[in-house]
Amino acid sequence: TDSSGLSNPIVTNSIDSICELLKPIRDSKVERVYIDEYYLSEKREQWIYSDSIEKYCTKEEIIQLAKEHKSRAINYIAFTLWLKKDPHEAVSYLIEDINNNDTLCAVKLDEGLPESLSSIRVNLVQRNRAKYNVSIEDSIRIDKAVMNAKNRKAIWYYYVLTDPQMDI
């Protein structure tokens, strides 16, 4: 691999250096991930990066970004692309990494709160099972992993499972 952590330096140039391991999407202390794709009919910046990563990166490079990139927002973006390409494999990684305590500022419209990356991923998968072709078996595997996770109280979906009045 090259210094950016990717196997193809052309890919890094093609997506405006977002794949460099030390570059977050924004130069600030708090990295934000936007849950909504559009806001006031303009596509959010991260989803433009998402389109570029999807266009120029191989599946292996997307997996590498999801697992190893130092930007948590890029981890999330790459995970969503991985989920589109291979839902079973992405869910297996989600379960393997469920105790990850890294946080992001998850923003929906203009409201944002710090949330664990595991929680954001679980909510993404469980809310969009049909969109990403996640099997019932994989969904049940996620439920079991959440219930047995060491950091289950940091995963919003845990409360959905334990309180019938909660919603994703």
What spans do the regions from the language model cover?
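Extended repeat-based scaffolds of very large eukaryotic assembly and lipid-transport proteins
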Residues: 2-168
